[in-house]
Structure formats: structure tokens, C-alpha cells
Amino acid sequence: FIFIYAPVCHMTWHPDGLLFKYGILDFAGGTVVHMTAGFAALAGALFLGPRTESERTHEFANVPYVIIGTGLLWFGWFGFNAGSALGVNAKAANAFATTNTAAAAAMISWVLMDAMRGNKISSNGACVGAVVGLVAITPACGFVNVGESIAIGAVAAAVSNMAVHFKNKS
């Protein structure tokens, strides 16, 4: 925490921070929270290496739990993003609305990408798309309007879907 998260917080939000000086905007911590977690996960995966053949069997997820979990995460994300406005005001309402629309647009985009590729449409895919939209909108939710949030969610889900397809194909 101290060696990874705190320096990134300083670089992003402190007026003397490196990223702050370059004009980086991060409303609700998407850069700080999601990038540090993503790089930590990448470091862990590189350290652990690929799975052995015996670990490659894929167990199916419990679909109702995935849907419930996604709904709870989506609901909690409203507090994460809208709460970053530090008040009940227009900025919080905008963050709430953009969070919801980005997640919904990403969910639809993910499902459409699967359908265009000829894959079976699944509720798990829709849930993954929603989470992609939530992550993508987090740094921008207080700075963009609803229309822009739809574009952010849809593009993020399309790019993520293609990346997952490419990863699974190779």
C-alpha cells in the first residue's frame, strides 16, 4: 500500500504530482485504484506463471450468483463514484447518471460483440460487460455527460471483448 498506492495517489491528486501537472483528471479514483490493482495483478500473474495442465479445467460459474454479485457491485459503485463529489449536488447526480449509463452501454456492447462474432450470448458476458463499463467510467464520471458516458462504456466493452477474444484464441 505505502510503496505502490500512496505514490500514485500523490502523482494523480496532489498539485505537485507528476500526473496532476500534466492535466490528468481522475474524479473517482479510476487511475489510482484500478491501475494500481491491475498492475499488481499483472505482477502476480507474471510471478506465478501459467497454470499447469491439471489446473486448466474450466468450472462453470453459478450464474444466479454472478448476476446478484454484479447487481450488488453496480449498486455499490454508485457510492464509489457519486460519493466522490463529497456532497449531494449536481456533480454527484451527474456521476450517478454517467456511472449507470456507461455500465448499461458496456453490457449491451459486450453482448452485441459476442453476437456479431457468432458466440452464444450469455448472462455472464453481460455481467462482465457491465463491470467493464463501471471500471471505464470511474475516472471520468464527474467530468462527462450522459451521452459521452455511453460512448465510453460501449467502446471500453468492445475493446475488452476483442482483447478477451484475442487472448482466448491464441
Set out the residue ranges of the language-model regions.
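Hydrophobic alpha-helical transmembrane bundles of multi-pass membrane proteins
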Residues: 1-170
